[in-house]
Every structure is written in C-alpha cells, then in structure tokens.
Amino acid sequence: MKTWGLCSDEFADTNHWPYQLYVREARRMIGEYVMSQKDIQTELTKADAIGMGSYNSDSHNVQRRPTPDGTAVENEGDMQVPVTPYQIPYRVMLPKRAEAANLLVPVCFSATHVAYSTLRMEPQYMIIGHAAGVAAKLAIETRRAVQDVDVGVLRARLRAQRAVLERP
C-alpha cells in the first residue's frame, strides 16, 4: 500500500477497496490422518494415492509487525519452497468416522499449514475433487462409509479415467 496504493480506476464506489478479500487459506478439517510437511518433502509415496501434487510450498507472510522505530512494516513467514512431485492420499479427504461417514472434504481437507500451502492450488483441487466424485459414487454403489471405500477399486477407476497416481 505504501508504494503502490489502490488501483485508481477500479471499485470507485468503495473508495477503491475491492468488495471481497482473497482468502488464501481458511479453516481445515482435522481428520484421522493429517497431511504434513513430511508428506511433501520426505515421505512422498502413499498406498492410497489418488493423484499427484507438485506445486511449490507457497505461503505468503503470516504476520506483519511494525519496525521498532514505527516507520515501516516487517513481514514474517513467507515461504516459497520447491517440492518434488508427491502423492496425495485419499485419507486427506476423510473426516473422523465418529464425526461423519458420508462426507468427503476435497478443499478444506486434513492438512497442516505447510502441506496445505502446496495442496491449496487449483490443479490439486481439481485432482482431489475428481477423486472425491469417483469415491462418492463408489461409496453409494457399495453402500459403504467413505472410510470403507475399497481404495484399490477407487485407484483403478481413477486410472481408467486417466488420472496420474504416481511418477512414471
């Protein structure tokens, strides 16, 4: 803001402030399995993989604070870290069984801040959303809780639909 200000030819009726702020990260479910930094950096393969992720670990500043003299603002927490392609497990979409047996969560899934920083991108949302749709259909067809979906059958259906589940 200090350097560039607001765009002078947009949002004239709101003093040039946008109607809605862009939310990069919101609340997330805490499932039985929480995907974390180790899943995107060291433990890259998963038996229940439903797709691949490869976007950088990308988090903007998490805190801004004034400098000691009060003349500027310092940013903390920026993270831009390249990742090796990693597998996305089906489990990230699963709520705890005691909380819901008929719900898949393809966006506010179970992940830490660091893991979510790479998973929150649209390509991964499309991959996870596709898998959620296939898994939901499979759960309905077999009259099973989403936690009991046969992951082997799910993966076979995803492959048949040309999903990429592992590195070549």
Residue ranges and their predicted role:
Residues 1-168:
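Flavin (FAD/FMN)-binding glycine-rich loop and adjacent Rossmann-like elements that form
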